[in-house]
C-alpha cells in the first residue's frame, strides 16, 4: 500500500483566522515572519492576520511574486535570520505558502536551495531543523497548506519541486472568509487547479483507497461549486466548498500526480515577453483535456473503471467525454483554452518536453509518456 500520512492540524471554517495566535503558541512560535504578497496586503487580509497575532513579534515579508523564485527565497530567508524569527506564517495563495516552505529550508539549512530539490536527491537533506510553518490560504487551488511540497523557480530557470514531511505546515488555518474578495478570474484559475489535483491523483496508479475517496469527494465539491464561486464571489457556501476541494486535492495528491503537472511545471518556468510565470492553475486547465485523452486507455484506468467513477463525481452522463467536459468548463469560466493564447509557441516545446520527462510527476502518471507523447499533448493544447 502507498504510504499514507494525514497529520496536519486543519481548521476549516469562517472566522478560523482568529485562531492564529493560539496556533502559534501551540507550536512554539513567538516571532513569526509573515510571508505574503502586495495584493493580500492591499486587500487588508494580511492586516487581519497580524491583528489576530497581537502580542507576538511579527515581521512581514510582502514581496512574494506570482510564482515563487529562488531569489525571493534568499531575500526572505535573510530577513528571517536578521529579525531573529522562530517560525513562519504564510498568508496568501500557493505562491506565498510555497515561498515560505523554501524559506523554511534556506533559513535553517546550509548551501544553495537547488541542492534540496527532489530531482537532485534533496528530500533526504531536509531535516527537522526546517522552520515551523502555519499556512493561511487566501485562494482555493493549490492546497499547499496541507501538502509536503513546494514548487519554486530556480535561478537557472528550472521550476522544480521540493518535498519533505518536514515542510508540511504544522497547522492549516483555512478561513473561507478570506477568499470572498477574490476576483472571478483568479477564482476560476485556482479552482481548476484544485479540480486538476483531484482528477489527476485519483488516476495515479498507486493503491491508496483513502486518497481516492478524498479526491473524489473533493472533485464533486469543486466541480459542483466552481461556477457559483466564480459568478458570485460572496457565495459563502460555494467558497467553503471550493476551499475544502482545494484542501482535499492536496491531501490526496501524496498518492501522485501525472502528465498535467509534469507539463504545467516546465510551462510555468517559460519566459513569455521577458517574464516568467504563466498561471499554474490556468495551465492545468488548458493541458488537462489532452492528458485525459492520453490516459483513457491506461491499464489501471480501464481495470478500475476510473473514468466512470470520475463521471459520477462530476455528475456527468454515462459515457460523457470527460476531456470535453473539462474544456467546456474552462470556456464557461472565461479562462484561456489554448497555450497559444498564453504566449506559448511551438519553438518552446523542446524545452518543455525535456522538463516534463524529468519532472517528479512524470513517473506517477497511469501511463508512461514518451517525448513524442508529450509533443502530441502540447500540440493538442495549443
UniProtKB/Swiss-Prot annotation:
EC numbers, comma separated: 1.1.1.61
UniProt key word NAD: yes
Catalysed reactions, semicolon-separated: 4-hydroxybutanoate + NAD(+) = succinate semialdehyde + NADH + H(+)
Xref: CDD domains: Fe-ADH-like (cd14861)
Lineage: superkingdom: Bacteria
Activity-regulation annotation: Shows competitive inhibition of GHBDH activity by the product succinic semialdehyde, and non-competitive inhibitions by the three other substrate-product combinations. The conversion of GHB to SSA is activated by two different saturating purified nudix hydrolases, B.methanolicus activator ACT and E.coli NudF. The nudix hydrolases do not activate the reverse reaction.
Effect of residue 197 to A: Loss of activity
Required cofactor(s): Fe cation
RNA-binding among keywords: no
Reported pH dependence: Optimum pH is 9.0.
Amino acids binding Fe cation: 193, 197, 261, 280
Ligand binding (NAD(+)): 37, 67, 94-98, 138-142, 159, 280
Pfam families in the record: ADH_Fe_C (PF25137), Fe-ADH (PF00465)
Transmembrane residue ranges: none
Keywords: Iron, Metal-binding, NAD, Nucleotide-binding, Oxidoreductase
Effect of residue 261 to A: Loss of activity
GO MF annotation: an example: alcohol dehydrogenase (NAD+) activity
Role: Involved in the degradation of 4-hydroxybutyrate. Catalyzes the interconversion of gamma-hydroxybutyrate (GHB) and succinic semialdehyde (SSA).
Protein family (similarity comment): Belongs to the iron-containing alcohol dehydrogenase family.
Name this protein carries in UniProt: 4-hydroxybutyrate dehydrogenase
Organism: Cupriavidus necator
The organism's taxonomic lineage, starting at the top: Bacteria, Pseudomonadati, Pseudomonadota, Betaproteobacteria, Burkholderiales
Gene: gbd
